[in-house]
Amino acid sequence: MQLPHILQLLVLITLANGTPIVAKKIFGPRFSFPMDAGTVFFDGRPLFGPSKTIRGILVSVLITTASAPLIGLDLTIGAIVAGAAMAGDLFSSFVKRRLNSPPSSQVLGLDQVPESLFPMLACRGALSLTIADIALGVGIFFIGALILSRFLFRAHLRDEPY
């Protein structure tokens, strides 16, 4: 079991997923360009929706990459974690649009699992993670994200308590 690596990844995954939320509060609507540029999929629904922005992805990648050495990981791992976490977030947003869920709505599991599973899988080889390590990391993130979201809502950093 690679517990130190799991914990390091959880820090980076939390950072990768949290920095776009903080950037939204700091910048408001400034620099908020939708990742899908308003593209509509063949089903008539947005590709990702307005809450997935280029600003959020750039801030996530920059901050997470720069933070990785502070917890003993390589810059490359930070970039991989951020990119994979954002890919997971975009994946869940895409699926939610296909399910006709409103933007920023909660779909339990779909909101937490891809955001943590994708980065864990992406770092599996570099950090010698086992399937058990990945399952544990995703499980911890799932529970932690539900708890942390409520605190962020109370601190007025999130618009919804999930």
Task: Describe each region flagged by the PLM.
Residues 1-80, 86-122, 131-162:
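Interhelical loop and helix-boundary elements at the membrane-water interface
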Residues 126:
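Acidic, glycine-rich low-complexity repeat segments characteristic
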